[in-house]
Structures are given as structure tokens and as C-alpha cells.
């Protein structure tokens, strides 16, 4: 074992690897010598030989010697018997065969085999025999197969091509003889002992297995490969990975799998179980089995090529590659080591296995992977000729394999959509391997989650591939296509960071792309329809597409390869990188396929342009603008050579245009090509192909594949996948059909028909993913525009605009693709963005700017409603908006239907959001093009993204990922990252921003500087959490600024459009007249306003873009629900016109909740739609009674006010501040983009006027809802339904409203998720505030002020806090004044109006709530409905009503909704909870106004309010209402105090009046513990990177509040176990899930319990309980912020307010209690009550979380984050969800984040304990999304609650901050300690010490108790659990404490802190 055979062959190893191995061997020899010396000395001295042997351990060696006569390897020793027997049997069977292939294989492996075997039989023998077996298989099978396949590119080619390509390097041996040579040669070469050559025996043994497998594979592959099943993606994913090595169709495949097995062999070698796992028997068996399944995989060929080329072989040995250039380097590399993981990933079981392989991983990944990977990358970069360890042989490389390799990689990526993170990195097969190896345990998500890994792999392997394949245009192109736009961009910018995100983009792109491309069905369909080609978008797109045309994928791919190499090579050659090449290739391929597909059977590869000629009429509309943009872009992309030649032809121009706008423009061409081609060819296949080319390929294929594949494989990924596959199912059939019909109809029919069809397709695309939707919408818009304008250029423009979205949408990865495609194609993000923007706007901007005056008025009438709504698509604005408007008008119902059918609410809405992101963006984009070009040159991506269609694409990517795309953007991060790669290079903020936009709205994503930053953060967007996180972040950035921009302009438009839309929407949102009226109103009346808003939009272009995605996302979450989804989708489409948005929502969702959801999102979307939202909500409530009326009147009223406030006030600051923040976020967060972005957003928001900030906050809240919707709509869309079911909430599941409620839940969740994003807190508060504000606004004519007021306190953290924080340094006092003024205004009219309106709405809501509880009004009864109702109620001032009505059921549901919609709806649930008390209805309204005033007063103390408001976000209004007088004044005074002294904040919050602040702070703190930790880390980084002014308040808030409040909270938790107990039940539930989730859940559960307690005693008892809860919760909230805040809101407005504002609430209810003895009384007197109630509620909640864990557990963390510190916690959740991309390094961090969103919703406890509690691998609390390392550990710490805070030890977090903050923190700590908060020592020293030890025991019992009561309580509404609660409170609290104070968390946190610091 120790002795190294003489002939050890390291040829399969890198030099470094071999060196390391040799070093190990040498050291082993030295050790053996030393041991022998020692033994010899002992032997000399010792008497007894036996004793001597026993002492020396020689006895074991002796036994081994006796056992195995040959002292070879342990592996050999272990294996010889079996191997020998097998050898005998094999010798009988295939003596010659075994020897021949072995010899052949050993020819390459000879030295390595012998050396290996000598080195270690386990390692070497397994490796050698495996590798030889693999090589043998590959060598023999590949050559004949390969030749055959090459020769025959038909169906056989597909099956055979894989083997052929793979085998081509091997190429010489027949398949039959493949197995023979290995054993003999192995024996000969390995130098193994003669008795039985372990290598030989193994080889022979596996030879037999291989023969069997080969035969099976051949049979299967011959039969099945030709009949690839498109939906075998789940299996094919793994199979794909398997196929990475198995290029031979059957034998090659199985051989490859053997190779993969050989790869696994490394792991097998590394660990004792090698014989079992290392044996080819198992792996090849698996391969055979998977081969059987693989036949389903239509991409075996592609897979093989891709795998082989991308990874050489997935297996360690990489026979074909190894044989070729550098077997030594190519065989045993990090990648090869990774490939066992990759290989495992290929097989479904393999990924798990790979994760199980960590035992081997250390050797493979640690020892070889990193160095080898780095060296590998260098080598690859250094010389193209030198094959990296995993590189493919040149043979394979330039044969079809590259295409297939990329395709296969892509396929693998997508097929592993469940492991989207993994597949995304897989796109670069090489990248995938190292990542796999790097994080074996995290392999599936590591690539995606680890930006660095991604970067490394992308860089290392893509560069290597570039070098390897750089010579081949096709490969570079294909590689780029594999990476999609990102690949081009990555390659353009450069592989290092670009590729990092390329990988992600591959993730993102590929997940959808792979879905579309990797889906065998599509592939096979592609044969007929060219869909399969698009299955492999970039790599295989043209090739496979042509192959599809030719029905011979391999041949087609080869031909395509050649042709593409001919055409794209021009691009590639000029580009050098495959940027343009890939873009061109992708686009060329696509266009070739798209345009050439119509002559499907023709030589499309070279004729695509000829085909384009044939399609010239169709192309003509594209040509006008695309030609010039194409030319410019192509020249930029250096696609111009081919592009020029192509440009000569219209369609070639289109492809050129496509190559130029890789994702954006190409899809445009594709879209129009589809339309044109559909028109020209009018073939459903062609439209499908075209659609596939542009959107179907991306969207339809992606959708279908994702739906189908995601259905199979996406479920592991979580909701993002679910969204994808939900969409896909519809999309492929429907979308294709719709596309075929739509394309034909659109082309044939004029504006209306395409609008209808397109809208249909758009919904499909939307449904398929936000991205798809946007693409469809854009296509529809561009088609409609073209037809509307009769303007080929414009249509092309829109087509270009649409296809980017389509492509971006089509591929989750596409999102970065547009950014990178557009930007990277251009070469630089800015230039590309500008180019895209200009190209876009060449036909769109020029059309927009030129024809916008004319077209906008004309189109605005129709489009205005949508234009305002579609302004978010401002990039596409005119065309897109126009398209959208007609689309909405013409096919509003169809879209609704499809959206509804789609059930991709967040995606659907999201796409629309992207489409209608900027109602005024068209106009604004004209200005913004210039202004934003300048402004966004800072955030080049942001500006360009905003202006370009990239922006819409980004969200699609994000959507796709998490949802998605993960999901949408479940994998969004990767996609974003790919897109961000260039952005990342420019700025990390931009990159992060891009992902956010990606998640939120690509259109806005690119408009917002936050986009790029978000891109980085959300690169995991394939993970849904990431997507929504990006959304959140993007919408935090975008939402903030965009809400201002959206608000005033959209608000005006909305108001004007809303009036018509109110009617139209109420009647039928789809009525063109309404849209036209709305558009006219928007276009006509708000023309000046629009100009103003445009100017303002230019300023806050990024901001403007953000909210719309929120709105859309919010709407999307509604679409997630059945009616809500459609309504909101349509509303989102008409989101610009809020009235339209809200009105349609009202009728469809069955009224108010929908409207509330929509109104809220719309209002949030509108910069100052708060008032309108409130009015809209009022209108909604009335619309329940009188649908149009409420919307109508408030709409008129609010617009002016909001416009004046938001437009006038906000226009000045929003953009600049926001941009700075954006930039900061980008630069701040590479890994922790979210956190930095959060800080950025915060700082950006403070830079905006408070009103604007409030408006932004509202929008952001809405966007948060939307984002949360997008994320949770995607991740929760399913989970929401699951939640609803799982929640056991009859009301929730009631009747038809549950779907709306579900959407609403998603909407709520979306805001919360959004809040979880960088501005998690702010967003968190924002939904609540916005609801509160909306309620106030709605309730009062002072609504805007009220809304602002409430929002200010509520948005204090987000909006006022950040807007005021923008003003905190510059307008803090002004905000204070504003707040006071608003408070005054609020107090008088708001209190009365809100009281009246609140009562009215409360009654409205209450009636529905009660009815909903009963079941008639499913909305309130449902948790989401309750959330929405509570939100609506809060919006409409019915905070108390809804909760009061549904107290028993509702509070629980509300809480559940809060939990389910935790991210977005937690705040709202809190508000709902707050609203729960009907007794407090009026007091709630009054308190709301008071609280608003108070919050307004608090606004000046934004830093303090930040956290305080986070505690108060949901209950800002409610809490304010509840604690209007004392809380108001106290809070105002306190907030001022806090503002004056940040440390005073903690003290103030400690004080009675600080109860609110404290609660907020505690909530914030807990969230800070969670998200605050990461956020603080990010903030600390931000403080280092952001101006102290901007950062300081926020950071201060985070630091102080997180620290002092966390400390105080922890102290309180320690002191007030009852509070902790409520948390404890939650932790009990979530402790399983995740300490992080536990804390959140505990808080949420506590809140829920309190809510339910309040429900039990909504009146004074509830309030006292709530006050107690608040008091306890405040302390407890410090530990678990969410608890305090949630219970107050749960308990009712008063209770919620008291809980939120603590003292004010208690002032209201128990004024002396909270006020006089604030904390002490809260500690003691309230404590018993509250603990009881809280415990009861917590038990209920916990049980609910457990009983309905999926809905409740997730919402609960969200509730916790959303409610108490919605910003922090929501941020945490959002960040976690979004950060999963970052957390991809975690095992399941990315997937877990998405899964967390999903799991919390659907799997909840079960998932969370595994996922969430799994070291809180960021997934549990979605914090993983926040930061990979930081979020992971920090999140765990935060999850740990007090300990997390303690472990954060605010000083540490603080240390990241400045000394100033540290001092403030210390002061806060001192104040907390001195002022009687929870004792500081336990908090500081070991928050977990007390809690773990003292609380742990009771924790378990409490947990159990809570579980049982919780199980009962969820149904009962927590009342039954109340007594238990008191009993359990103490145990529960320890649970929380324990959960909060996990030692691991502490360490993790510190590690994270270090990581953060290092990152900083």
C-alpha cells in the first residue's frame, strides 16, 4: 500500500498532482522507514514478538500479508479476489479483448496505470483499470462509433455521435474490443504483481461489466439514443454528467460512464469503499442503467460531446482526452476528480454520491483540484494545444464534441436543474468538474453557489476550452453559447471573473437553456421543429438545430459546427474570444436555425442567412433597425465580418444582430425571426423553431424542458425549477404552439392578433419564467410595435428587445447573457449595454426617441397603461410597452389565462415587470439613454441594462433561476453571474445589481446600477432564492430609485391610466380601450409629469426600474395564485397604470386581496403609489364592493400627491444616491453582493428624499412583495400552494381565493423576499409600511403623507431610513421634519381617515377576512389572504379588521401567510397580525397614524429607526396606530434621540418608547443576527467602500441595532425566556430547519403565537399579551426580532404596534407597562402573559411550521425577518434565498436557499432541519443568499439568535464598520446593559451559553410541547396552545436561545466575519 510500484505512471496526473502524490508517497516511505526503524528498535528491545507486533502494529501488516500474499496495494489486496475471479471469467470471455483495449488504453495510461497501481492499488488500480476501462470503452467504442456517427449524422449520429465524438480521440479500437486491452495492459503497465494484476483483474472485471454495459448501452443507445426522450432531463442530467465522458452513443456512453466511474474511481480509490464504488461494475452499471434512461436524453450526443470536450471526460481518466494531448495532465485533475461528482451528477444518484464522496474529495479536490484547477486554468490559458487534465483531445475537440460538449455541459447543467448551481457551472464542463471536486459535498450547488468556484472553473476551464477550442470557432462559439451570452461576455471581458459568472450564467442560462436544449424531447422535437437545437442554445443551438433540421443532431451539429464555424468563425475570429463568436454563434446558430430552420431540411447551417433571405420579409421588419444596430453591434462584437456578410441578408443581419446582441439582440432577431419566419413559413415548427430560436429555444424549450426537466430534476432545485418546469410544461406545447400560432399570427395578423397570440405566448413565456414572459412580452411588444407602428425597425427593435428577454428569459442564464451578451458582446458592459441600448434603441431608442414622441403618444394611448407598466421595459419601452399594451389589451384575458395556467406568477409578472418595469421608461429611456448612459456609466451595466433589453433579460435570468430560475433564479445567481462577469469586472455592484434586476426585472436590472451587483449575488438565481434575492436586491436598488421614478411617472400615468384602467381593469383589464384610456391618461395628462418623471427617471432610472420588477414580481406572485397570478400579471403588464393593475386584480382575484396585492405591488411599483396603493387598496376593498370606484377615486387623488411628493421631491436625489449605492454594492459585494448591495440600497435610499424614499420603499415593499413573489412566487408558487395545503389553513385553502391568496402569499412573500434582499430590512418594512402607508393613504386623503409617514417609520429602515438616510446625513433632519409634518398631517386626517377608512377597510377586510376564515372570502382566511388582507387592510386601514375578523384562524393564517409569505408577507402578516385585533381597529388606525407620525418622527433617527422600524416595518402603521400617542411622541423623541445617538437607539429601544425601536431593533437585530450579520458584514464592507454618511446610518443601524439590539435582544431572550420561548417553539421547529431559520421561525412563531394570542384576545388581553409580547419580544426580538414584531402585528394593530414599537404599543395598551417599566415590566408583567400567548402562538406557529412546515416554516423565518425586522430578516431571507448562489459553496446552500423558500413553504421543517439547519447552510433562512461564507456562518449565527448576535458580537460586525460605529455600538451595549435590557454578559459573552445550557433542556421539551400544541394550534388558531405556551415559553425560549446561540454559529459567524473582512 505504501510501496509505490516502480512503473507508477503519472501521465494521467497533472505535474502538480503527480508531484503531490509523489510527495505523499515519499513521505509515506519516510514514515514507513521511520516506523520500521522504530519497530526494529522495539524488536531489538522487546521480548514477545506478538506483543511487539501488537505494539508496533506490525500484526496488522502481518495479517494483511497473510491475507494478501502480494504486498501490492491495499486496493489490490482488497480487490484481488474478486478481480482475480473476474479476470478468470473475463479471460474466458474476452481474454484478447480485455488485453487489447487495455493495452490501447494503457498505451496512454501505461505509465500512469503502472505508477498509479504501484502508487496505490486503491488509487492507481481503480484509476488505471477504470481509466483504461473507460479509455478502452472510449477508445474502442468511440472510434468506430465516432467515425460512424460522424459519417452518419442522422438519428444514429445523435446516438452514435456522442460515442463517436467521444471516441474519436480514442477512435481506433472497435467498440467490442474496447474492453479487452485494458486489463492486460493495466497488468503489464501497472507493474502489479504477477499473481493477479489488480489493474488487470479490475480491468477485466470491469471489462465484463463494460461489455454488458456496452451491449446494453449499444442496444439502448441505438434504440433509445435515437428516441431520446426530451423529458429525461432529470435522469439525463446525471446521465449527462455521465455522458460527459461517455461520448460514444452507446458503448461510448457507457464507456464514458465507466470513465466517470473511473472518475468516481478516484474517490473510490481515495476511500476504502473503492471496490464497491470504484468498480466500474457499479458506475458502469449505473451508466448502463442511466444509459437506458439516457436514451430518453436526446443529448447523449451533445452530452457526450460536451462532456468529453468540456471535461474531457467526466471521469478521472478521461480516456479520449487523456489519450490525446496531455493524458498526464488531462487524466487526473481537479476536474477529473470533480468529474466523479460531475459524473455522479450526471446520474441522479451520482450527485448524492458525489456529495457522499467528500471522503475522497479532500484528496481529489483539496490536493489536486485547486492547484490543478488553477494550474489547469493557467495551462489552458497558456497554451491552446496543451490539454488541461480534463481537456478533450483535439480530435474530440473539433469533431462535434465541442458543440456536444457544450451542449452536453449545457444539458448537464440543465438536466441537473435540480442542481442548477452545478449545471450552471457545468456549462463549462471543465468548470463543472473542478467545482464538483472543490465542493464534493456541495457539488450540485457549489459551482453555482460559489462565485469564485464558478469564476475559477469558468475561467480555468472555459479558458482552457477556449484555448483548446479557441482554434475552433464553433467550440469557442459553442462554449460561449454554452455560457450563452455570458460566455461571450465572459470571454470578452475575460474568463477569470467573467467566466466565474459565465459559469453562473451557464448555470442560469443553461438551466433554462439546458432545459430547452437539454430536453431530449425538445431535442427530438428539434429534429422536427428545431427545438432540440435550441435545447443547446449556444453550443448546440445552431448545430443541434441544424441537426434537428437535418434530423441528425450529430451531423447537424457537425455541419452546424462547420457552418457555424464558417459563419460564426468570422465572429469568433474577429472576436478572438468567443464573445461575439459565441454571440454570433449562438445567434448565428439560432438565426441559422431560426431563420434557416424554415428550410429546415435545407443546409441551414450555411443557408440560415439564405434562409434569412427567404425570410427577408419577416426579417425586414427586423432588418431596418437591427441592421444598423447589428452592424454597430456586430462591429463591436467583431461579429461584423460574418455579420456583414450576413447583414447583406436580412436574416443574416438578424443573426449578426443576434450575434451582436447575443442574448438580447439575437433573441430579438429570433423573436422577429420567429414572427417573420412564422409569417413567411407559417410553419408551426418554424414558429416553434423561431420561437425556439429566440424565445422558444430559450423560453419555450427552456420552459418545456424546465417544466418537464425541472419537473423531474428541478424539484430538488426547488421552486425556481418548479417555476421553470411549471412554465415549461405549458410553454413547450403551449408556448411552441402559441409561438407557432403566435408567430404566424403575429406575423400574419396585425397588431391585435399578435398581441393576443403574443400575449398568450407572452404569458407562456412569462409563465415559463419571468424571463420567458418578458421575452414573449417583448416579442409581443415588438411585434405589436412593428405592426402597430408598421415599423419593421421598431418591431425589430422590439424584437431585439423581446428576444433578449426571450433568450434571457428563455435561459435563466440568459439573464446575464443579455448583460454579458449585450455588454460583453460589445466588449465592455457599458459599451455593450450602450450598444445594446443603442442598438436596441437604434431601432428602439431611435424609434423610441425619434418615434417615441410620435409613437409614444400614439402607442402610449394603448401602451401608456402598459407603457407605464411597460416602462419597466423601457429599454423595450415603446415597442415593448406598445407590444405589451396591445398584448394586454388584445390578449389580456389570454395572458391572464396563460399566466394563470402558467402558474409562474412571479415569473409571469416578473417578465411583465420587466416589460412594464418602466412605465415612463420609454420616455425616460430617451433621456435615460443619455442621462443613464452617463449616470449608469458608473453602473454601466445598470444604465445599459436599464436601457437595453438586457435589463429585462436579467430578471428573466434571475427569474429563470430561481424560479428561478432558481428557480427562475433558483439558479439565477449563476445566470446573473454570467451576465455579471463583465459587470463584475467593471464593478461588483453592477454585477450584483444585474442579478437583482435579473431577479426583479431584467429591464430594470440593467437600468439599475444595482443590477450588476445583484447579478453577482444572485448568480445562483438558478436557485430561486437567488433569483428573488437578485430581484430583491435589484428591486431594492431599483425598487428604491425606480419606485420613485416609477411612482411619480407610473403613478401619474397610473393615476391617469388607473382611472381608465380602473374601469377597464375592473370591467376587463384587457380591454384595449381601458388600456388606451389609461395610456391616454398617462400619455396625455401626465405628459409633463412624464417628462418630469423621465427626468426623474433619468435620475433614478435604476430606482425606477427596480419597483416595477417588484410590482411585476408582486403581480407575478399573484399570478402564482390562479386569478391573482393572471390579474397581477396583467396588472403588472398594466402595472404602469396602477388603476389598470389594481382594477384587474380586484375583479380577478376575487377582489381585495388581489387588488391589495396588486395595488400594493402597483403602489409599491409606483414611486409614490403608496397613497394610490392605499387608495387602490381602498378601491380594492371597495372594489370588492365596487371594484373600480375605490381605485378610481384614490387614483386621482393620490397621483398628484404622490407625483408631487415622489416626483418633485424624489426626482432630485433618488438616482444619484441610488447609483452610488449601486456602485458600492457592486464593488462591495463580490461574494456578499447582497449584503453590500443592501447597504448600497440603504445608502442609496437615504440619499433620496424621505418621501421619495418612502415612495421607493413602498414600491420597494411592493417590489419586495414582487421580488418575494418572484422568488417565493417561484419558490413559493408551489410551496405556497403546498403551504396553503400544508398550513392546514382551511381558510387559506378556501375556495378559489387560495390561489389568489397563494399569489398573494407569494406577493407577500415576494416583498418579504425582496426585503430579504440587500434592502431586506427596508423591503421588509416596505411591504408592511407600504401596506400601512397604503392603508394610511388609502384611508386618508393625507394618504401620501400617511403612507409616507407610515412608510417612513416602516421604510425608516428602507425608505425613510434610507431615503432619510440619504437624507440622514443630508436630509435626516428634513425627514424628521417631514415625518413630523407628516405625522401631524397623519395624526389629524390620517387618524380619522385611517380610522374611518381603516374601519371601513377593516370591515371590508374584516368581512372578507372573517368570511375568508369561514371560507367564502378565502382571502382573509388564507394565510396569504390574511397577509394580503392584512396588507390590504393596512393599506386600506383595515389592519385591525382583517386580523380581528380572522383572529382564530386568521392570526395563524396570517402568521402562516407571514411565514409563507414571510419575506414579503411577513411584514404584511405582521401588519395583518397587527390588524388582527378588530378591537384595535380604530386604535390601530389611530395608532397607525400615530405610529406613522411616530415613524415619521423616527425617520430622523433613521439609523435607529432602521432597526426599530424593522421591528416596526410591518407594524409601523399598525404599531404606530396602536401606540399612536405615547409611542408616537416617545418614538419620535426616541427616534430623534436614536438619530442623535445611534447607541441611544438601543437604549431608546430599551426604554419604553424604545420598545418599538427596541422591538424593531431587536427584530432588526435578530435579522441582523441573521441578515444583519451578513448585512453588517456587507455594511462594514460597505462602510469601507461607501461614504460614511451613507453607510454610517445604515451601518450604524445595522451595527448598533444588530449589536446592541441583538445583544439586548439576546439578553432579553436570556432574561425573558418567555420571549425566547415563543422563539423557542420556532427554533424548535426551525432548529431542525436551521438555527437561523429557527431564530427567524421562533420570532415568527412567537409573533404568530402572539398574533394568535391576540386573535384569542384581540382586545386588551391580546394587546396586553402583545405588549408583553412586545416587551418580551423586544428583549426577545433582540434575540429574535421577528418575534416581537410579528406578535404585535399578529395581535392586532395595537398589539402589533406595541410589539413593533414596544413602548408605544404598550403605551396604547399598557402604556405604563411598556412606558414606565418598559423593559422591566415587559420583562416581568407582560412576560408571563406574553409568553403564554406567545408560547401558545409559538406552539401554534411552531406546530404549524411543523405541521405545515413548508408554508409556515419558511414564512416564519420570513415572518420573523419580514415582521419584526422585515428588512433585516427579509433581507436575510431574501439574501439567503438570493445568496444561495453565493451559498452555493454550501452543500445545499443555493438549492437550499431556494429549497428553503420552497421548503419553508412546502418542505418547511423537514427540509429545513436538513437544509436549513444543516449548519444553517444559508438555505434555512435564505440568508445563504445573503453571503456565501458570511451568510452561511453569519446566518447560522444569526439563526442562532442571541448567540448569533453575540457571536456577531456586534463589535465584530462592528469592527468591520468604523471605529465610530464601534464606539456607538459599545455605547449601545453599555446603555443596554445599564438600562436593564437583557443583561449584556450573556449576550456578549456567550448568548448561547445561557441559552444553550439553560434553555437547551427546556428547548427540546418546549419544542416538543410547542410541536404538539403547534400541531393543534395551527388549526385552532393558537388559542389551545396558549396555556401550553406559558409552559413552553421557557423551554421554547431556551430553544430559541440555544438555536440562537449555537457554538457553531459563533464560530461560523466569526469565520464569516473573517471572511467578510477578507472579502472586504
UniProtKB/Swiss-Prot annotation:
Disulfide bonds: none annotated. It comes from the Eukaryota. Interacts with RAB27A. Keywords: Phosphoprotein. May act as Rab effector protein and play a role in vesicle trafficking. InterPro entries: EXPH5, Rab_BD. Gene3D superfamilies: 6.10.250.3000. Signal peptide: none annotated. Residues 1939-1950 have a biased composition (Acidic residues). Residues 7-63 form the RabBD domain. One of its GO terms (cellular component) is endosome. Residues 325-334, 342-366, 635-645, 808-835, 910-920, 933-945, 1062-1074, 1356-1365, 1470-1493, 1520-1533, 1637-1657, 1732-1741 have a biased composition (Polar residues). The modification Phosphoserine is found at residues 799, 802, 1027, 1083, 1117, 1493, 1724, 1739, 1789, 1819. This is Exophilin-5. Residues 1572-1586 have a biased composition (Basic residues). GO terms for biological process: intracellular protein transport; keratinocyte development; multivesicular body sorting pathway; positive regulation of exocytosis; positive regulation of protein secretion. Residues 692-707, 921-932, 1318-1336, 1392-1403, 1534-1546, 1561-1571, 1951-1960 have a biased composition (Basic and acidic residues). The gene is Exph5. Residues 325-366, 616-645, 672-720, 734-835, 910-976, 1035-1095, 1291-1375, 1389-1493, 1510-1759, 1828-1847, 1906-1960 are annotated as: Disordered. It comes from Mus musculus. Residues 673-682 have a biased composition (Low complexity). GO terms for molecular function: small GTPase binding.
